[in-house]
Amino acid sequence: MAYPGKSTKSYDTPQHPWQAERMASEVELVKKYGLRNKRELWKSLSVLRRFRGDARRLLAESAESDLIGHSKTEADQLLTKLIRFSILKSDSNIDDVLGLQTEAILERRLQTQVHRLGLARTARQARQFITHGHIAIDGKRVTVPGMMVTREQEMNVEYYGTSPMTKESHPERPAQIAASVVEE
């Protein structure tokens, strides 16, 4: 365990630095999700690696016998967490965790959700709106684009109350959002 007052890396870098296929796929994901750099991608890969490692360990324990006691509790907690973040469907089991891809984690970032909900035209613009304080969840300003959004929070993502983006005449506001505000 690391010293509590010291920051430690929350990601692992690739094993080999120059693999053309891996680098090309990373660039595509960085562009698609509007990430600032590959470090953000590596963080999501590390989160996914941790989930899958826990699932593998629990499946190995269940191979000896059915999940009982602490193992069953831990498996239920892992599934509950992944279902709460909408990474897995509600009828999923521990085997489904092994089939997860990086995109499942990246889709749950606040930056991606703002773009998917139509509050921004592009993923990069969504990142800018978040860092500039134009986005709120449950009325509270959020300025972290990499925040993982739960299913409940997803319903409450909106423009911050005092943000100039709340005005339908703002030039950077997407047209469909402005039209829905005028109708209300």
UniProtKB/Swiss-Prot annotation:
Gene Ontology CC annotations of this record: small ribosomal subunit
Domain S4 RNA-binding stretches: 108-172
Organism: Methanococcoides burtonii (strain DSM 6242 / NBRC 107633 / OCM 468 / ACE-M)
GO molecular function term, any single one: rRNA binding
Subunit and partners: Part of the 30S ribosomal subunit. Contacts protein S5. The interaction surface between S4 and S5 is involved in control of translational fidelity.
InterPro entries: Ribosomal_uS4, Ribosomal_uS4_arc, Ribosomal_uS4_CS, Ribosomal_uS4_euk/arc, Ribosomal_uS4_N, S4_RNA-bd, S4_RNA-bd_sf
Top-level lineage group: Archaea
Keywords annotated in UniProt: Ribonucleoprotein, Ribosomal protein, RNA-binding, rRNA-binding
PROSITE patterns: RIBOSOMAL_S4 (PS00632), S4 (PS50889)
Pfam family, one: S4
Record's protein name: Small ribosomal subunit protein uS4
Job description of the protein: One of the primary rRNA binding proteins, it binds directly to 16S rRNA where it nucleates assembly of the body of the 30S subunit.
Single GO biological process annotation from the record: translation
Region (Disordered): 163-184
Family the UniProt entry places it in: Belongs to the universal ribosomal protein uS4 family.
